């Protein structure tokens, strides 16, 4: 009934995971298990997120503290260690093994199903879908619940994946939430677990439970009707569509199918679908334009200044639109584009560093990321590390100071970072470390 944030595996004490066992847990029966993958290796974050739903439905939740964005082999080894250890110590229902992840963790969850020869009953993918190395193909053997924030730069990818799952005849559902590139909120996380329970009933992985099915059906039908009555036609259309798909074969879904068809033919829904597609196109064009300008900034000397000015102009315009109070398509496109460009250059810098690229290349990528996301403490910390590796103490200390001002407070990370060794004797470095320790 409590989250244990670090459990060391029996075979390797360096491999740890966060763990939640429901209060009703007993080794005398087999339990569904949800394996979680956070892109920063914060196993407790998703375990806490899914804890309430796990308690309600009787699931074990496990989150790796070692798996993270970066080298795939290391993350897969972390997953293997976690799988083997929990299989040895916890009574797991092998037919009901699930995985969830956010961003790169979502891609890893789907990759694991491929590598374990389809051992997963379901995947809850937040903020990203399939790995870039392969595409979905029939039959999709696991149930897929996709989620993305309306401001997430990967929102178009998740919508496209949902459509692809439909074409492949897969068991799937997609839900959006207010927010950006992040884990879903607790309510949606609970809805995903509830949906997996419903799919388990449909697939014969758990006993038929008419009371459970009736309860979920009644609540979701009322929600869909409420959306339609409130003239939220597109949300109602999506709600009736998923309701019909989820309960087909369990209940009479003719009302849901009828309302979905009627709403789908309405001007409001057609306009919403058209606007959604246009948002995707605008994001793609803007991101491509910014990538091209960023490349030109490193090109011929004569064109650098103009490219830099054009880049700044577009970014400043997007930033202004991103601050708008109203949730409009224009605001969503601005936020998604800024997020996409930031992530692109931040991840490029991380890859360059892992490949032991020349420090100036890492600095260049992070400078672009910091220009697009000037309020990110993590980016300025990474920029400080890159400047130090490039033997530039002055710029490194300036970036560290900015990171601290923005809220960076992981003094231990500074002290453990080898690239910052040349700064250890600097008075300002010591002052920044002490300030971080008291934050």
Explain the meaning of each model-derived region.
Residues 23-30, 72-106, 114-117:
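Gly/Ser-rich "nucleophile elbow"/oxyanion-hole loop immediately N-terminal to the catalytic nucleophile
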Residues 223, 243, 260, 348-349, ...:
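Structural register within alpha-helical repeat arrays
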Residues 117, 248-251, 374, 408:
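Short coil turns that delineate tetratricopeptide repeat
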Residues 145-148:
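Short beta-strand/loop motif that positions the catalytic acidic residue
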Residues 29-40:
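Short beta-strand element of the alpha/beta-hydrolase
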Residues 45-62:
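Short amphipathic alpha-helix adjacent to the substrate-entry channel of hydrolases
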Residues 1-31, 75, 220, 272, ...:
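A domain-start/cap signature at the N-terminus of enzymes
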